[in-house]
Amino acid sequence: MRALLTSGALSMAFTLFLTPVFIRLFRRLQWGQFIRDDGPQSHHAKRGTATMGGIVVILGTLFGYFVALLLTGDETSVSALLVLFLMVGLGTVGFVDDFLKTRRERSLGLTGWAKVAGQVLVATVWALLVIMFPNGRGATPATMSVSFIRDLPGLDFANITRFGAIGVMVGYGLYLIWINFIVAAASNGVNVTDGLDGLASGASILAIGAYIIIGFWQSIQSCASSTLNPENLSKCYDVRDPFDLAVVATAIVGAVVGFLWWNTSPAQIFPGDTGSLALGGAVAALAILSHTELLLVLIGGLFAIEAGSVIVQRAYFKLTHGRRIFLMSPIHHHFELKGWAEVTVVARFWIVGGLLVAAGVGTFYLEWLAT
């Protein structure tokens, strides 16, 4: 419990007090935001605002997590390190994208395919790592099964690998596709949500905060726990290192809370792709390692709505040869163009995101009660 509280406090203090230092540094380096010409006119005033704030969030998370372990004497776990690996890996892809934008002085960095290639590379390496490193019980950080609140026995890709060489290729291939899909959906969902001051940061606090609750509860009801009530043995969670997942989630939330102080309207710094891809990677990693992959539809529901609005807009535009459903996508820009103030859009989207997170956590708990 000490590590849980300490990691969040330290990471929040880091970003809260040091973000102004990074803002001045980024301005000196001319790492400023460039704005789409076809975007809302009110956004043009944001041109030149410091970007790549994800660097601060990542550093704050690492500082809070590792210093907390040092102070409490606790040891890290493979699962927690894997969350940080995906977060930093995707953050690096985002940094390259942001850096190219600042060098080229335009709002486009990496090409779409180059960004996808970077995400696929990081996600594929990560997907292979999470089914390695078994502990004394033989449990790996993740499994090859699709999960909702627990692994779904009928959707275990490992079963396919038993059918010879072709089965191995198909089983691992489907597993890698599934993990890449989750990582891409989460990271790009947060990425497209990052279009208004504080929107993606606040939504990420809510979503990742859910995994603090989930990880803590899973640790109490863990099948490996020596204090587990025998009456609950039939509904215990077979999750590797759940408390450590809660600790690293707390460090991330603390870092984003401190960062949000400077990112809220009028923002003095933006997360950039560095931050949005990193936070999306953290969400994906926590969902996969806590065996709650399909529950992410609720916990990350706001990100799904934002990403879905982009997909629907583009598909409808092509099918109707130029017509649009929304005035502009992602959908938060639609409401801006409808006349909503930016802070109103952000506040209402936070409410929607919070309700979806509450529904996700509630579903998680109800499943335990019903088991």
Curated annotation (Swiss-Prot):
Major place of residence: membrane
InterPro entries: Glycosyl_transferase_4, PNAcMuramoyl-5peptid_Trfase, PNAcMuramoyl-5peptid_Trfase_CS
Topology with respect to the bilayer: Multi-pass membrane protein
GO cellular component: plasma membrane
EC number: 2.7.8.13
Cofactor: Mg(2+)
GO biological process per UniProt: cell division; cell wall organization; peptidoglycan biosynthetic process; regulation of cell shape
Catalytic activity field: UDP-N-acetyl-alpha-D-muramoyl-L-alanyl-gamma-D-glutamyl-meso-2,6-diaminopimeloyl-D-alanyl-D-alanine + di-trans,octa-cis-undecaprenyl phosphate = di-trans,octa-cis-undecaprenyl diphospho-N-acetyl-alpha-D-muramoyl-L-alanyl-D-glutamyl-meso-2,6-diaminopimeloyl-D-alanyl-D-alanine + UMP
UniProt keyword Hydrolase present: no
Residues spanning the membrane: 3-23, 51-71, 76-96, 113-133, 163-183, 196-216, 242-262, 269-291, 349-369
UniProt KW keywords: Cell cycle, Cell division, Cell membrane, Cell shape, Cell wall biogenesis/degradation, Magnesium, Membrane, Metal-binding, Peptidoglycan synthesis, Transferase, Transmembrane, Transmembrane helix
Compartment(s) of residence: Cell membrane
UniProt key word Signal: no
Pathway: Cell wall biogenesis; peptidoglycan biosynthesis
Main EC class the enzyme belongs to: transferase
Gene Ontology molecular function: metal ion binding; phospho-N-acetylmuramoyl-pentapeptide-transferase activity; UDP-N-acetylmuramoyl-L-alanyl-D-glutamyl-meso-2,6-diaminopimelyl-D-alanyl-D-alanine:undecaprenyl-phosphate transferase activity
Pfam families: Glycos_transf_4
Family of this protein: Belongs to the glycosyltransferase 4 family. MraY subfamily.
General function of this protein: Catalyzes the initial step of the lipid cycle reactions in the biosynthesis of the cell wall peptidoglycan: transfers peptidoglycan precursor phospho-MurNAc-pentapeptide from UDP-MurNAc-pentapeptide onto the lipid carrier undecaprenyl phosphate, yielding undecaprenyl-pyrophosphoryl-MurNAc-pentapeptide, known as lipid I.
The protein, known as: Phospho-N-acetylmuramoyl-pentapeptide-transferase
Organism: Leifsonia xyli subsp. xyli (strain CTCB07)
